[in-house]
Amino acid sequence: MDNALLSLTHEQQQAAVEQIQELMAQGVSSGEAIQIIANRLREAHQNNTSENNS
């Protein structure tokens, strides 16, 4: 399991869903949209983690 994604608040989850839906409305497949948003969330989590460890 991906701990970074498990720790999302309800608001963050809702924002992710909305971003996925927006990508799908632009013609991106659902799987690709989920992957794009998941990667963005992982990157943001890694950046936050590295900033907190500095």
From Swiss-Prot:
It comes from the Bacteria. Belongs to the UPF0181 family. This is UPF0181 protein APL_0863. It comes from Actinobacillus pleuropneumoniae serotype 5b (strain L20).
